[in-house]
Amino acid sequence: MALLQIAEPGQSPKPHERRLAVGIDLGTTNSLVAAVRSGVAEPLPDAQGRLILPSAVRYHAERAEVGESARAAAAEDPFNTVISVKRLMGRGLEDVKQLGEQLPYRFRQGESHMPFIETVQGLKSPVEVSADILRELRQRAETTLGGELVGAVITVPAYFDDAQRQATKDAARLAGLNVLRLLNEPTAAAVAYGLDKGAEGLVAIYDLGGGTFDISILRLTRGVFEVLATGGDTALGGDDFDHAIAGWVIEQAGLSADLDPGSQRQLLQIACAAKERLTDEASVRVAYGDWSGELSRATLDELIEPFVARSLKSCRRAVRDSGVDLEEIRSVVMVGGSTRVPRVRTAVGELFGCEPLTDIDPDQVVAIGAAIQADALAGNKRGEELLLLDVIPLSLGLETMGGLMEKVIPRNTTIPVARAQEFTTYKDGQTAMMIHVLQGERELVKDCRSLARFELRGIPPMVAGAAKIRVTFQVDADGLLGVSARELSSGVEASIQVKPSYGLTDGEIARMLKDSFDYAGDDKAARALREQQVEAQRLLEAVQSALDVDGERLLDEEERLAIAAQMDTLRELAGGSDTAAIENQIKRLSQVTDAFAARRMDATVKAALSGRRLNEIEE
């Protein structure tokens, strides 16, 4: 019989028993894999000594080519070479079409509106393309480390929603990787800098990659990383800089903007090379076709200024959400290859009033942090464990009567988290309840995003408001949501794992947050009106039900007419938009029915006690 070896508490495995785990930065433009070796977290090279793997996959009839050679073939074979696939993860075909001018692929819609890319090898989903990249990184790691991996920590943008996170986990599973945890990229950067520098205090993580931007405000204490607030833009990055330069070339050369896919890829490669050279040079010569011209760093600054300004706007909002002042932030960590652009570093330094930290290679810092966390989760870490506290980017809640959004877990709540809230029935004899799960910051359902619906059946028939339904929202460490509903008296229960088929459209998260600020006053007024309208309807139904049962028996005609008049007035006001008037009329109807309610209670008590002796009542 096989025996399981169990280490004593507090004892780390021996060096030769070290479990192999890696951190993976699955980026829009480039990807890396890193591991802790001899106590130091470092990126792992391929056979040629290269650390960075371009996030590019070229499909041939019988095989997939990943990395540098695939990216080099993008211009000559654009339809079979997939780059920036991270932008497609967890999205629907309609969302992807909005990026059509940036993505020269032939798309076809699959099940659940998922986009598929037509290649010579057949249809490929974004999940499959990402899996090919992850598989290449897994093979590199196992070759370098000399053994099979027990798992990986994979980083994702903090702004990735549930669908995008689930798509990332699916890609890892296809690649044969056990996901120890999905880790927000800014948090991974904090892990790297926190351990390397012993940093404490408030820190901003400015993460500008190829296709996404994240800003996170963290409180760092020894061994504890708490995300106070996050923000960003799912469609902002170095790719936009490249497109701006490409647009400038087209304008300067007097060319048509309607380029074929191959020419488009070639122009973008030229633009990217010019951008990278301008990091160290004041100006560069750009040549495309028969045209050539001089691109200065000053011109580049002008071209990218709108994108830099967008990132700074997100920074200010994140600082405001965190409840701290700009002056309190001690340092800014720069993450992502796009932060090498001088204008970006200058603008960030001016906003936060300090020189940005660039001690660790901005291309490597996320993978290094993920490797440190993977090492800890694999059980290799000695001494004090890391405590990572991520947050959810948008509030989660459900629909209540009147089309109102009731927030159960507010945005920027630390995860993992479970929150429960009790709700009740709206109508007498109600035996089922539809649970509508929502995401967003607005007060009305129509302004929020629907995540899922499920039904709770078997609720015992009761008068309205008597049943107690406890709804529990549970978000795990990967940011994935589960919702359950339970009727407390009967124990009937229903639940759902929220797995939407595609994610938010480009910029929708940012728009939802912006709208929540812009329409805050209007939303509160609309919510107050809906709440009073719902309360008015509830009261009218309750009074009418009571009148039908006991009106003739307990009220004289004058009392019935007085109540009816107040009910008519409330019905009329409830159809309008005067919140205060509805509230006042609810009070008047309640007052005029107080005596009726008291008589009904007396009659109920009298009926309950009828025929019983005093000693029976006392017992």
Curated annotation (Swiss-Prot):
Superkingdom of origin organism: Bacteria
Example of a GO cellular component annotation carried by this entry: cytosol
Family matches, as InterPro entries: ATPase_NBD, Heat_shock_70_CS, HscA_NBD, HSP70_C_sf, HSP70_peptide-bd_sf, Hsp_70_fam, ISC_FeS_clus_asmbl_HscA
Disulfide links within the chain: none
Nucleotide-binding found in the keyword field: yes
Entry's Gene Ontology BP terms: chaperone cofactor-dependent protein refolding; iron-sulfur cluster assembly; protein refolding
Pfam families membership: HSP70 (PF00012)
SUPFAM superfamilies according to UniProt: Actin-like ATPase domain, Heat shock protein 70kD (HSP70), C-terminal subdomain, Heat shock protein 70kD (HSP70), peptide-binding domain
Keywords from the UniProt entry: ATP-binding, Chaperone, Nucleotide-binding
UniProt entry tagged with the keyword Transcription: no
GO molecular function, one term: ATP binding
Entry function: Chaperone involved in the maturation of iron-sulfur cluster-containing proteins. Has a low intrinsic ATPase activity which is markedly stimulated by HscB.
PANTHER family, per the entry: HEAT SHOCK PROTEIN 70KDA
Family that this chain belongs to: Belongs to the heat shock protein 70 family.
Protein name per the record: Chaperone protein HscA homolog
Organism: Pseudomonas aeruginosa (strain ATCC 15692 / DSM 22644 / CIP 104116 / JCM 14847 / LMG 12228 / 1C / PRS 101 / PAO1)
Lineage: Bacteria, Pseudomonadati, Pseudomonadota, Gammaproteobacteria, Pseudomonadales
